[in-house]
Regions:
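Conserved acidic residues
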Residues: 13, 73, 81, 106, ...
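Residue-level signal for alpha-helix termini/capping positions
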Residues: 9, 68-69, 97-101
Length: 274
């Protein structure tokens, strides 16, 4: 979470962080990131919403409500396992200025890289979303949607967005195999509820098997500056032979169409590009 917050800090006047009721030092870690820019919203997670990831959107909306009360034109959203790459800062600030007063534009659409197993590989099959909204107008009619992957406005209406040449790095699948399995076990309750989690916890599932993946490619570009120390401290290995990728016929067709047209055809879009 530290790197996530640091990655957006240069673009923000204030960063509002929703911190749940915990005793693991998270609140102290967040508060220490910046002496004046950090504002913490203390929350209690509603376990009655532990189904289909709804509780994640509920927590997001708590922070959004605090952000709506500010006089900012734009709100940047980042999740704890995401990092905004500084290479996109100029494009983001230009887009913010250009579309600030355009009432048709609800938000800005960013590109995604999903890292998997280690910081050396990104997932490339079609079920990993290629884009998502991470910057929205300060509009109280906008809210976090379903499992907090994206946003809606009004009566379940998709947001109108402008694409921006900037990348969010998603590192949620880069952990020690044992830590990854523990995360998966803990995360089950947000979709299946506490009762299911109790049964799940009785079983020692060992280490997470990262080899069960259909398609990866090597990442050879720089990571965000805020990630450098974390990457240096890596103490596990994950090696994958990209020649063994098992892309489905569906994915092969989508990739071919993308090369020919430059558009991601037949993929679900949680937004409207205008």
């Amino acid at each position: 979470i530290k790197e996530a917050i640091l990655s957006i800090l240069p673009l923000c006047d204030e960063v509002i962080v929703a911190v749940g009721d915990c005793t693991d030092g998270t609140r102290e870690l967040v508060q220490a990131i910046h002496p004046t820019k950090i504002k913490i919203i203390d929350t209690v997670w509603n376990t009655a919403l532990n189904r289909d990831g709804i509780v994640l959107a509920d927590e997001t909306n708590k922070a959004l409500q605090a952000a709506f009360a500010t006089n900012s034109h734009w709100l940047i959203y980042i999740q704890g396992d995401e990092v905004l790459h500084e290479d996109g800062f100029a494009a983001i600030t230009q887009a913010m200025e250009k579309h600030k007063d355009d009432k048709k534009v609800d938000g800005l659409l960013l590109n995604y890289r999903h890292f998997y197993g280690s910081y050396d590989y990104i997932a490339t099959s079609s079920h990993w979303y290629k884009n998502e909204i991470r910057i929205i107008k300060n509009n109280v009619n906008i809210y976090s949607y379903k499992d907090a992957q994206g946003f809606r406005k009004g009566d379940n209406e998709k947001l109108n967005v402008k694409p921006v040449d900037a990348f969010v790095h998603h590192y949620g699948w880069v952990k020690k195999p044992k830590t990854m399995m523990n995360k998966r076990k803990e995360g089950v309750k947000f979709w299946e509820g506490e009762k299911y989690t109790e049964e799940y916890d009785k079983t020692d599932l060992g280490d997470y098997d990262f080899s069960q993946i259909d398609s990866l490619e090597l990442y050879k570009k720089p990571h965000p500056q805020v990630m450098q120390q974390r990457i240096i401290n890596v103490n596990w290995k994950f090696n994958y032979d990209v020649s063994f990728n098992k892309k489905t016929l569906k994915d092969q067709l989508k990739n071919l169409l993308f090369k020919l047209t430059g558009k991601r055809l037949f993929e679900y879009q949680n937004y409207k590009i205008i």
